[in-house]
Amino acid sequence: MERGRDRLHLRRTTEQHVPEVEVQVKRRRTASLSNQECHLYPRRSQQQQVPVVDFQAELRQAFLAETPRGG
């Protein structure tokens, strides 16, 4: 039991040190989930501790920043 908890903690700490690009890819994939799917995984969203509203706003900003205007 103790070993399993250590492994989980290790995984969590390594995730925090992932390069920014990979984090953005992960975020985008998470945001593409439908609202229904988000309700199916309440525990996962609690672990991330990121409010969905802030999440979507941040994503929209990133998307607008990447999209060339008037192209």
Swiss-Prot record:
Protein family membership: Belongs to the SNURF family.
Note: Encoded on a bicistronic transcript that code for two proteins, SNRPN and SNURF. Only the primary 1.6-kb bicistronic SNURF-SNRPN transcript is detected.
InterPro entries linked: SNURF
MF terms in GO: ATPase binding
Taxonomic source organism: Mus musculus (Mouse)
Tissue expression summary: Expressed in brain and embryonic stem (ES) cells (at protein level). Expressed in the brain, ovary, testis, liver, heart, kidney and muscle.
Keywords from the named record: Nucleus
Superkingdom, natural source: Eukaryota
A cellular component annotation (GO) from this entry: nuclear speck
Subcellular locations according to the entry: Nucleus
Name the record gives this protein: SNRPN upstream reading frame protein
Pfam family, any one: SNURF
